[in-house]
């Protein structure tokens, strides 16, 4: 049985590349076949045995507040600085409310629930869910030494080799994410828009390695722009439904 019962969802982003679709709502509320990304994700988490979900909010946060009123397992922590900071600050802003193993997720994901079980059952306390190449645009590429994180970047030229792509679901131990918080604190003045994935790379070393669990044909997508949404509707969702 998994010892992880908490999930953190990073949901503060503006979603500006989706233009009119996210002017008045967060991108987690985009719908696929009548259900929002966020509510589908919450359902997957609850089914996986997660009983506490903390959502880091920002843009149009009232939508998440309304969602939390329907789920006793959900609480929200709002970041007043969401417009000028990155995903790592959204996570850092929750630091006083977290001290247990957790799953860290992005809010704009459409994914098969098997990925959650893969992480929850993985023997490493710190493990990133990864996939094979998606060719979706805006990928975060991962370099490993076989099964441990070495580097991550959206720029292929910054990596020695590309072994996988970041899905946006990670299992983290308190020790690792508190190291990420400390790194965020030390770099905030110069890098306020720090992404959480860069903080993971910064704290991953020989003494604190982060595993990478790759599922080659894993059905998932992040929805950051119109092309991602069309891929979700035409390719990813049919694969999830039929599996």
PLM regions and their residue ranges:
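Conserved N-terminal catalytic core of the sugar/cofactor nucleotidyltransferase
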Residues: 1-9, 35-101, 190
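Conserved alpha/beta core of the MobA/IspD/sugar-nucleotide pyrophosphorylase nucleotidyltransferase superfamily
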Residues: 2-7, 165-243
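Glycine-rich N-terminal loop/short-helix segment of MobA-like nucleotidyltransferase
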Residues: 2-32
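Conserved beta-strand segments of alpha/beta enzyme cores
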Residues: 28, 73-75, 209-211
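A structural signal for short hydrophobic beta-strand segments in well-ordered beta-sheet cores
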Residues: 29, 142-144, 212
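Short beta->alpha linker loops
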Residues: 33, 59, 82, 195, ...
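Short beta-strand-to-loop acidic/aromatic patch adjacent to the donor-nucleotide binding site
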Residues: 100-110
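Conserved core of the sugar-phosphate nucleotidyltransferase
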Residues: 112-189
């Amino acid at each position: 049985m998994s010892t992880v019962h908490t999930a953190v969802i990073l949901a503060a982003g503006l979603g500006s590349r989706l233009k009119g679709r996210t002017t008045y709502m967060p991108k987690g509320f985009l719908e696929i076949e009548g259900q929002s990304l966020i509510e589908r994700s919450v359902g997957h988490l609850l089914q996986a045995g997660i009983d506490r979900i903390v959502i880091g909010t920002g843009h149009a946060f009232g939508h998440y507040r309304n969602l939390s009123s329907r789920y006793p397992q959900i609480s929200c922590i709002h970041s007043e600085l969401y417009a000028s900071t990155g995903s790592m600050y959204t996570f850092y802003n929750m630091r006083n409310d977290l001290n247990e193993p957790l799953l860290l997720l992005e809010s704009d994901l459409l994914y098969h629930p098997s990925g959650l079980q893969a992480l929850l059952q993985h023997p490493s306390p710190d493990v990133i869910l990864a996939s094979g190449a998606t060719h979706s645009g805006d990928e975060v590429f991962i370099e490993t030494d076989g099964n441990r994180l070495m580097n991550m970047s959206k720029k292929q030229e910054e990596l020695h080799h590309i072994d996988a792509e970041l899905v946006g679901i990670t299992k983290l131990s308190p020790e690792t994410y508190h190291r990420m918080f400390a790194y965020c604190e030390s770099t905030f003045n110069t890098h306020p828009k720090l992404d959480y994935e860069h903080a993971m790379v910064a704290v991953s070393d020989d003494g604190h390695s982060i595993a990478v669990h790759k599922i080659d044909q894993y059905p998932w997508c992040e929805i950051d722009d119109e092309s991602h949404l069309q891929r979700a509707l035409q390719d990813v969702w049919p694969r999830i439904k039929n599996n």
